[in-house]
Regions:
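Beta-propeller domains
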Residues: 129-202, 208-209
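PLD/PLD-like phosphodiesterase catalytic module centered on the HKD motif
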Residues: 4-89, 96-103, 107, 112-118, ...
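N-terminal carbohydrate-binding/catalytic regions of secreted carbohydrate-active enzymes
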Residues: 1
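Aromatic-Pro/Gly-enriched surface loop or interdomain linker
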Residues: 89-93, 98-157
Length: 359
């Protein structure tokens, strides 16, 4: 609501142009999107400054672009929906670029998407078939692509990313809202979880409604196999003094990012609004970022580790009355033992944390 209030203030001053999704129930007369559209037109002298559309799926980007004297100078992108859930409940990321070049690119894509006619011709345009690469000294290495793509370009992008995941040398970390869609990228991620060649740690939102269609991969002593945990559908009985876990309306994990080799020679994170699903990448309005910068990658790595550690604990279906981290009378079962056993994932995790980044 607070963001909507500010947007409507800008609309009243004729300082806002907006593309708002109208897929499915987003265009219902009783929808919040419809209410916002009507309020926009009530306060603005330029009712055409709001355009509804969905390409051929969803208008799925989450972007703000700032302009001064008709020149873009700042842009916000990422996975965050500008809603109460998106800001206060979901796990999300947002990235702000102050590069004029990056901001202008997003502004040009916005103009090329503004209105249903432009959306219908976007797929196949230069914006949808080009990887926009920024390698200036003032920026980290960045590649940005804009969907919906023609099938050949979606395949090219997905092949490049899945090959990088399959070739991970030190680690793979991820937080993906839904990792079971048809996608060579998501297949590569799932395959890494099942192997022990690199440290793999990840979280998705929902495994299945009854946890039978797909399985979580929890910590297994004396094994280096990866972890994949779920954030929703958990039915834990928490140990005292904790009570019942509050239900969440919507997603807990809304991220869509994959980190490859955060301690390797060429760390990279793939992030943005794309769900990394092959079909939607050919239908939805989306943006996918590839960032080669150790500091940025480390920030995403910490987020993945934070989420997995918490929800792994939640996934264990705790039933005991007390939770003992350590038994001082029996150090053979001390909680930290596994962190020093060669061949154990915990030991691999400790070594990853303390190791120097490769150069």
């Amino acid at each position: 609501p607070e963001i909507c209030k500010r947007l409507l203030k800008l609309a009243k001053e004729n300082r806002l142009k907006i593309i708002l999704d109208n897929a499915g129930d987003h265009d219902d007369p009783s929808s919040w999107e419809k209410a916002f559209e009507q309020e926009f037109k009530n306060v603005s002298d330029e009712p055409e400054f709001i355009q509804r559309g969905n390409f051929s799926g969803l208008n799925h980007s989450k972007v703000f672009i700032l302009l001064k004297n008709n020149k873009a100078f700042k842009v916000l992108s990422g996975s965050t929906n500008f809603s109460t859930n998106g800001l206060y409940i979901n796990s999300n990321h947002a990235i702000i670029f102050t590069s004029n070049g990056v901001a202008q690119l997003y502004s040009d894509v916005f103009d090329a998407s503004f209105g249903e006619e432009n959306m219908s011709s976007f797929k196949g345009s230069d914006f949808s078939t080009t990887d926009f690469i920024f390698d200036q000294a003032s920026l980290p290495g960045i590649s940005i692509s804009f969907a919906p793509h023609p099938k050949a370009d979606a395949e090219r992008i997905f092949d490049r990313i899945s090959n990088r995941i399959n070739g991970a040398e030190t680690d793979l970390l991820f937080a993906i809202m839904k990792d079971t869609s048809t996608s060579s990228i998501l297949d590569a991620v799932q395959n890494k979880v099942k192997t022990s060649d690199v440290f793999t740690y990840g979280i998705t939102d929902v495994i299945s409604k009854n946890n039978t269609d797909y399985t979580v991969f929890l910590y297994k002593p004396n094994s280096k196999r990866g972890l994949r945990v779920a954030a929703r559908g958990i039915t834990n009985v928490l140990p005292k003094p904790f009570g019942k876990v509050a239900a969440i309306d919507g997603y807990a994990i809304h991220h869509k990012f994959v980190v490859v080799d955060f301690k390797g020679k060429n760390p990279v994170v793939y992030c943005g609004s794309s769900n990394l699903a092959f079909g939607p990448e050919q239908k939805n309005g989306d943006n996918l970022l590839e960032i080669h910068d150790r500091d940025v990658v480390t920030a995403f790595a910490i987020e993945a580790l934070r989420l997995v550690d918490h929800f792994h604990w939640r996934n264990r279906e705790l039933t005991q009355d007390e939770l003992n981290l350590d038994d001082l009378n029996n150090p053979a079962t001390a909680w930290y033992n596994a962190w020093f056993i060669p061949g154990d994932l915990r030991s691999l995790q400790r070594e990853l944390y303390i190791s120097a980044a490769q150069s």
